[in-house]
Amino acid sequence: MNVNNKLIVIVGAYSTGQYLAPAFISKGYQCIHVQPGATISPFYLDSFRKHDFINNLVWEGDDESIIQELSQFDVKAVIPGSEIAVLLADSLSQKLSLPTTNDPRMSSARRNKYDMQKALEQAGVNSIPVFKTNKSEAIFNWLKSQGIQYPIVLKPISSAGTDGVSICQNQEEVQLAFNELIDTVNALGENNNELLVQPYLHGIEYVVNTVSSNGRHYVTEIIRVNKITINASPVYDYAEVLSPVEHELLYELLSEYVKKVLDALGIHFGAGHSEVMLVNETTPVLIETAARPIGGIDLSAYTESLGYNHISMVAESYLNPENFHKILLPENKLPLRKRLLCTFMISPIHGEICNRPDLMAIKNLPHVHSVLMKTQGVLEKTSTLINCPGFITSLGTNREELMQQHQKIRQYEPHLFLQMVDSTIGLRR
């Protein structure tokens, strides 16, 4: 194997993070992967592309052994590819004394949702009142002391993808959700020893994706998110990329706020994926920020819509910062090349998948760009983004047509999922 010294280290290259290595390889760099633990959740591991790396180093609690392995290379940067990689990437980058290290004092606040909101509060940035506990009675005492009314949100302190999130309308629902969640293992393989409590925010939810370079923050795209509530859990319905030209004032409002968030969390380099609620149409409030790329999207569709994507801009920011600044300077914002709408599939049934889904009717819809659907294993009733059975990405020039197509996809869903679990059809895999 021909190994050069130009090296990028990617920690936890899962989900959309699997495409980081190809982006750097295309620019002449080689990549080493650090697996952030001996055991990785199948939710992540299924997306790992081992062939993109010259080595896969397994971290088992000892940073120094990883540092020793990396010391023979000229490491340009250590980059987290997924949520479970954030803390380890911070630690390795700091110990390698890399100039692209984010503020190590704020590392926990980039992962722990309690510490995150407290960091915003301390910095004077709009935040949500939060409380963490391992006792349900403490929740009720805190709600009373703060004068917080129902509904409230109960969720893990450090998970992702709406995993374990419950919207509770009364004390009984809080107790039920608490009992179901406390001391369980979340979707990322971490223990829910404590839970986070916060008031429910009413408003419109947005995703603000960013890339930072030497403390300068750039918004790559803003996505409006629509969710529905199923059995007290927020479930993704659809998401649409917003035009920075058509929504100029909204872009300015959300961008200015999220940049303050990134400063408060000590993010100077790399990707940011922030979920923001716009309350009363005027006040942005952070739900959470992830210091890694957006997960679970079709990058090719985003490239067609924007002319670039989150991953390509991360690579550009580290290796060609001048061009990166040029592309994302606010005054260079251009209209969308195409409108993008993502439909998240919602299964109302649970069962073993017996048959390949017949997706031809959906694929033949005029604006469908790509279809990603679970085809084996167990089909679960959709309750989180993590057990979402698939998503369909559509591109077009007319928003009304995209929304009509979204509704048509919803009409196909019941038959599609029934067919997948019907053992009498005979198209077994």
Regions found by a protein language model. Give the residues of each.
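A glycine-rich beta-turn/hairpin centered on an aromatic-Pro dipeptide
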Residues: 323-366
